[in-house]
Swiss-Prot record:
GO MF annotations in UniProt: rRNA binding; structural constituent of ribosome; tRNA binding
Protein name: Small ribosomal subunit protein uS7
Record has ATP-binding as a keyword: no
Subunit details: Part of the 30S ribosomal subunit. Contacts proteins S9 and S11.
Family: Belongs to the universal ribosomal protein uS7 family.
A GO biological-process term: translation
GO cellular component term of the entry, any: small ribosomal subunit
HAMAP family listed in its UniProt record: Ribosomal_uS7_B (MF_00480_B)
InterPro entries tied to this protein: Ribosomal_uS7, Ribosomal_uS7_bac/org-type, Ribosomal_uS7_CS, Ribosomal_uS7_dom, Ribosomal_uS7_dom_sf
Signal peptide range in chain numbering: none
Function: One of the primary rRNA binding proteins, it binds directly to 16S rRNA where it nucleates assembly of the head domain of the 30S subunit. Is located at the subunit interface close to the decoding center, probably blocks exit of the E-site tRNA.
Disulfide bonds: none
Gene that encodes the chain: rpsG
Length: 156
């Protein structure tokens, strides 16, 4: 408990084109070395590719992808009597979004397509269809939590 109180979390402004805070947060996650213009160009190009490929609204495809990526459970290490246990816990809503965006960007960067906007578009479309590396990461996280269900009573 801090003596001087908690700092208020800074509110993210919605992006100008889709008027979505989630898109704005994705731009921030994509950004390297403070180059927001480059990051937003990559994202909007990826959304154009999604529109061409699926014919659907890219924001809806992205939101569906995020719903398929965001984890509900995760494990946290807890030390009890000299041994560490992986204790399954529920993920808070803000952390769900953060983890989903992080996994989406990281696994997009690991793909083999030529340009980043192509990689991001393919990863978003794969995630919307419940396939892809970021969805696999979520499933692995859920499997870990399920496997360690016996230690759920160590929750704090």
């Amino acid at each position: 408990m801090p003596r001087k109180g908690y700092t208020k979390r800074q509110e993210v402004l919605p992006d100008p084109i889709y008027n979505s805070k989630l898109v704005s947060r994705l731009i921030n996650k994509l950004m390297l070395d403070g180059k927001r213009g480059t990051a937003s160009t990559i994202l909007y190009d990826a959304f154009d590719r999604i529109k061409e490929a699926t014919g659907n609204e890219p924001l809806e495809v992205f939101e569906q992808a995020m719903e398929n990526i965001m984890p509900v459970l995760e494990v946290k290490a807890r030390r009890v009597g000299g041994s560490n246990y992986q204790v399954p816990i529920e993920v808070r809503p803000d952390r769900r979004t953060t983890l989903g965006l992080r996994w989406l960007v990281n696994y997009s960067r690991l793909r083999n397509e030529h340009t980043m906007d192509e990689r991001l578009a393919k990863e978003i479309m794969d995630a919307a269809n419940d396939t892809g590396a970021s969805v696999k990461k979520r499933e692995d996280t859920h499997k870990m939590a399920e496997a360690n269900r016996a230690f759920a009573h160590y929750r704090w």
